[in-house]
Amino acid sequence: MTSQMVLTLSVGALRPLMKRAKKPLDIFELPTFVNEEMGLRGLNIPSDLLAGRTPKDFERLCDISDKAHCPFLVLIETPELNLWNPVNHPAVIDRLRRLASAATRIGCSSVAISLAEVTTQARADAVVKTLKIALAEMDKFEIALLLQSGTGILSDGKSLVDVVKKVGGFRIGTMPSFQHASTNGGVSQELRKLAPYAQSITASVKGFSEEGDHAEWSLDECVETLRAVGYVNSLSLDYLGKGDPIKPLSMARDMLSAAIEAAEPA
């Protein structure tokens, strides 16, 4: 049986449901809700949603997600991290160590971060040095570190991949998004560069026209591009629009599922 992409959810997309006044969705309900109500098979969770939680809470989340067959996969650090300024090194390394510990407790295999804007090659080189130190600490937890596309010179996929290559090792990778790829060279061009180094990709969902077409970028083109480079890891749906996210996420799920199935050989 051929491996194929798996559809998961970026939990941040459900913030409106978690913050609503009437019957807010509790964090401990997420795995069952996402599996049974949305038909998705894993969770990428922003770090701010875990703020104030205890180690016992983390273990409970891991247990619930295992029983719901909807595991936590990636812990996403919410704020950008400045890795090029040496003044920040102690705090950044400590933060990444804490994230790796939390990720292990809830069952994640990866931590994803966004880099504060890098404007020069010297700063990009400084980022590489900091990442090597950070990975040495994170390796104790057997957690991978994924770099999300950002701003500055690392907004280009090739430049971000160069950082990954310079850091080296199998615990460093990328986590691109459809949205960023669309606005930085186009989904086909950027995803071709980044997907071979990705352990998870954010399937950004903007909205749909009355005819049912996705706005701004083609979900079919995204899947076709990923298939062309042999990507078989997770696609984590994330809604960027306003209002109730369930309908657009469900439409995107169905569209992506159809595209994935169509891409599979008979």
Model segments located where?
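An active-site-proximal structural segment forming one wall of the substrate-binding cleft
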Residues: 88-110, 125-126, 130-138
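Active-site groove signature of glycoside hydrolases
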Residues: 103-122, 141, 145-150
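Acidic-and-aromatic substrate-binding clefts and catalytic sites of carbohydrate-active enzymes
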Residues: 23, 45-57, 80-90, 117-125, ...
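P-loop/Walker A phosphate-binding loop and immediately adjacent motor/lid segment at beta-alpha junctions
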Residues: 65, 215-239
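A structural motif
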Residues: 39-40, 70, 108, 198, ...
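Acidic/histidine-rich catalytic cores of soluble enzymes
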Residues: 6-7, 15, 36, 42-43, ...
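N-terminal pre-domain/capping segments
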Residues: 1-105, 169, 250-266
